[in-house]
């Protein structure tokens, strides 16, 4: 039976001279890969858009659960990100977003609420201020914590407390080493308790501190996340 679903493009690998395998996260099926054929009659710009990471497509396909690579009948471009192609900071946060989502969602099932959150965040990237763009990846990650069910309990925060990874709460530090992590925990508290966290006046060093804490926390709960390469690019920009 033919099914229509939206999806977010996460990457593409050339399969042949006129086809690529596109990796995505879809609204109806979760992680999904499909073969995209470059039609000779299709305008080159429109065809290339199907391979741009963070593009949003609508596809019609005869979905077969046991088929690793799906074969869509129709594809329609709904949204193509523009700022990452013309702004270095937007490009860096987009690269990070793609790498993070690819690692986190590569074997995930359908989660419509998560998909819709990601769709709106990606579309909203085009309208953020310069300050907001610089913190987009941090806002996205804190939102992911909520949708993945591991958002720390902000009501447990007290000044100089640290994030307890196993409990998902803030607690007093137990050692001098932990005291050094209290500042990053305070930044996380600000982010999860602010209505517009991307507009918080953070320095580059503060963004990198918070990014490391968020990655460590995600890695604790999702060990397959591994070490990402793109944070190094972000640290150089900030």
Walk through the language-model features, giving the residues of each.
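Non-catalytic alpha-helical scaffolds and adjoining flexible linkers that form interface surfaces
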Residues: 1-21, 25-238
